[in-house]
Each structure stands twice: as C-alpha cells, then as structure tokens.
C-alpha cells in the first residue's frame, strides 16, 4: 500500500514484482495506490503456488468479490480434496518438529498416497479429530519466553488446506492497511506504506500501539460469530472449533481454554486477521471517514499497528474510543507499548521552539523510526535496526558459535555468511548502512573471540583468525 502523493521506497520492497490489476475497493478508500504484491485478481491466494489453485477455488474468490455479504455453505469438499491435501503436505517444512503423536514429515510420506486418502475420507465423513498441540517456547527480546504450539502433522496439513480455501474469500474482504500474515504481503510492504504515508500525508502525531496478549485473549465466541458472517458451511466452522478446543499438552497435562488461539499453526494468523478485521479494521475505516477532519494514516501488522494523525486532539479522541471499542471484545492496549508521540515533518521545529529537544522515536517491525533529513535538507523517515533486536541476535549468535566451535572453519564461516546475508536482506534499507556494518563487524568479532579462546586442536587453521566476518 502506497501513498499516491509519493513514490514507493522500492529498495525495501521484496524482489517479487507486483501483480498487474485494478485497485480493490479497500485501497481506493485509503487514497493510496495498490500495494505491490496485492491480490486484485482471483488467480491466487499465494499460500500455495498459482498452479496449485484449481478453477473451482477461483470461482469461490470471484463469488466472494461479487457479493461481500454472501455466505458460503459448501466449502468442505475443497478442503478434503486429496490433491490439495498433497500440495499442503509438500509445502510443510520437512525438518519441522513433530507434534504430540511424534509423526514426522518423512515417515508420513513413506505411505503418502494411502495416508492422504485416509485423511480425506475422515474429513469427508466427519471422523477427523484434532489433537492437542505440543507446548514449545522460544526466547523473546526481553529475556522472557514466548509460548508456541506444535500441531501434529495431519493438523498442519488440514489447517494449510483450510487456510488456502478461506483465503480465497477473506482476501477479497481484508482492507488495504492490513499486512500481517497475508499471501503476497510482507513486513517490508508495511514499512513502505508507513514511511510513504508519514512522508506524503500531513502527519504530526503518531500512535504506536500494541494489543496486550492478543493471541491469548481472543474470544472464541466472538471469533465464531465473525467467521459465520462469511462461512455458512458448518463442517468447516466445526473444524476450526476443533482446533480451538484441542488444547495444549505440556508436561503430560492437557489444558483447554475458551480464549485465545495457539501460535504455531497456520490457521492462527488467519483467525487473528479475521478477528481484527471486524473488531479493528472496519471500525477504524468508518471512524476515519466519518469523524476525522485531518489526515489519518494506518498500518496494521497482526496485533501491532501504527497510526499517523494530523491533529493531536483527533489522535487523543481516537485513542479513547479505541480503548472502549477493544474492551467490548475482551481486548486492551498494552499500556507500556502504546504511546502517542509528536512525529512528522514539523516535529523537530515545533519541539525546538518549545525547548523540548529532538522528536521521540518509535519502533515497528524491527526498526526504530526517526524524524530525519535528506541530503538536500528535506524531511524523511529514517529507519535503523532496533537496538534490542541487534543485541538479541548477537547474543543468540554467541551461543550458537560456542556450540559450533569444534567444527571446521569453512563450515562455521558458511553459517556466519548465511546469518549476515539474512540480516542484510531484512534490515538493508536506505540510511541503515552504519547499523548493517556494525552488525557484520560484531559477528566477525564474536567469531574471532571464541576461536581465540578455544584450544588449538579445535580449529583446522588459526592463520585466518581475525576481527572480520567471512564473506
């Protein structure tokens, strides 16, 4: 999504070229051009490749686009189609962790045709049963642990098939400013939309907000009601309810909640987007059209969103009403992660006049956003790698290097090269060069220190030790 008054920062948009097509209604309402990679035609969704989407599913997409109120009462046959299940299976990560049943991708594939046919038949006659997800944890930047759920392999397959079918409907409904976990969209496009929106519109105040524990507090009752606006096939709705009620298995104990959707399965991001489409997106769109007098910019990525306002009083009014809106659906803004700050083209000048120093910054999708100037002295939004992200990545890298310290130097060098390339691909945006160089240098230093502290026998050659990272 791009502001029509400015040019896209194309260097941070993924390499995939944009689709050709007409604007969808949501983005016309945004007053911006069509997003690169958005889906105006019904030739996809891209959770799977275009060639894997049969004409029957394209007809579902076309019907959804023609009538925004149509409820689809016959969808399950798209889900239990053996070919679609096979494509879903092959799209899974081969080395992904197994669920509570221990079934792996490779073992399941030894009798793939027979297993998929059996799965299809169970789905068809209503005998399919969802299993609890296995609890796993990954570290967060603040040192805490983020809980995830690992579904069993067959649940992964069926969820992916359901997501493909439902995307054919919901991708015609979702609004242009929603970017998180959608086919053909990416964090870089959200960053692009935000930067161009702040630069091209009369933005003077920025609301940086986060919904507290969204994935844990999402209300199942409301979610089912929202789904039933479009999905009239009770068999598909029951499938979703089975996953919601399957529970979590941790230390041999199964727990079930009437709230939340476990992060880890492919269905959770779609359910989150459906929930926020009705709770947040449609409401924000209506508020902006009917109550805002100045410019308003909005970009949402899952439960994290940033909004730009021309007038402070409108931003404060919106924030008050947003809290009330979310409370009606069991949600609340995170008090420590929600801020209204002066940010925009005139922020530095205004704050200097009041003796308040430089404008505050805000973080979004791994970048710290800063009011800056171009080489010609014009206003621009600078984006630097978040310090916490930078430090957390280096800390993880040190742990991994210690684990690999006895491996041959070329093998470790190849690993570090992949780390640096991956970092550059995400954080390599204009005017972030110094942070990129600093990261590369820090990676090299970490490797050099660990090798210098290791016994000579642990390295095949010590002549190449030094402070520079490989590649």
Predicted regions and their residues:
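Non-catalytic terminal/accessory segments
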Residues: 1-471
């Amino acid at each position: 999504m791009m502001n029509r008054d400015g040019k896209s920062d194309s260097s941070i948009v993924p390499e995939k070229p944009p689709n050709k097509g007409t604007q969808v209604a949501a983005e016309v309402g945004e007053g911006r051009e069509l997003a690169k990679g958005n889906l105006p035609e019904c030739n996809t969704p891209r959770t799977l490749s275009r060639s894997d989407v049969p004409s029957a599913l394209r007809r579902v997409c076309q019907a959804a686009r023609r009538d925004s109120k149509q409820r689809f009462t016959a969808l399950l046959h798209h889900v239990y189609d053996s070919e679609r299940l096979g494509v879903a299976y092959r799209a899974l990560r081969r080395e992904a962790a197994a669920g509570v049943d221990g079934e792996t991708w490779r073992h399941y594939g030894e009798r793939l045709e027979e297993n998929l046919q059996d799965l299809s038949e169970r789905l068809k006659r209503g005998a399919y049963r969802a299993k609890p997800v296995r609890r796993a944890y990954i570290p967060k930047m603040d040192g805490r642990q983020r809980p995830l759920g690992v579904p069993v392999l067959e649940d992964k397959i069926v969820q992916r098939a359901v997501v493909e079918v439902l995307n054919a409907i919901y991708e015609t409904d979702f609004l242009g400013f929603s970017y998180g976990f959608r086919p053909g969209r990416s964090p870089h496009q959200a960053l692009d939309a935000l930067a161009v929106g702040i630069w091209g519109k009369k933005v003077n105040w920025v609301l940086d907000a986060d919904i507290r524990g969204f994935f844990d507090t999402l209300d199942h009752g409301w979610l089912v009601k929202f789904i039933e606006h479009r999905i009239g096939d009770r068999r598909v709705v029951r499938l979703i309810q089975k996953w919601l009620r399957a529970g979590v298995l941790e230390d041999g104990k199964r727990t079930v909640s009437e709230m939340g959707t476990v992060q880890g399965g492919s269905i959770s991001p779609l359910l989150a987007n459906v929930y926020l489409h009705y709770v947040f997106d449609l409401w924000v769109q209506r508020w902006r059209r009917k109550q805002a007098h100045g410019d308003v910019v909005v970009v949402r990525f899952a439960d994290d969103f940033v909004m730009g306002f021309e007038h402070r009083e409108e931003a404060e009014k919106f924030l008050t009403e947003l809290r009330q809106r979310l409370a009606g659906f069991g949600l609340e803004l995170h008090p420590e992660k929600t801020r209204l700050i002066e940010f925009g083209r005139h922020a530095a000048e205004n704050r200097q006049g009041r003796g308040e120093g430089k404008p505050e910054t805000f973080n979004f999708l791994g970048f710290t956003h800063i009011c800056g100037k171009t080489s010609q002295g014009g206003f621009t939004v600078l984006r630097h790698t978040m310090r916490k992200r930078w430090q957390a990545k280096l800390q993880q890298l040190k742990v991994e290097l210690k684990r690999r310290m006895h491996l041959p130097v070329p093998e470790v060098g190849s690993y570090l090269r992949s780390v640096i390339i991956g970092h550059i691909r995400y954080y390599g945006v204009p005017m972030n060069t110094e942070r990129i160089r600093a990261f590369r240098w820090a990676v090299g230093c970490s490797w050099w220190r660990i090798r210098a502290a290791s016994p000579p026998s642990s390295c095949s050659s010590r002549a190449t030790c030094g402070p520079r990272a490989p590649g």
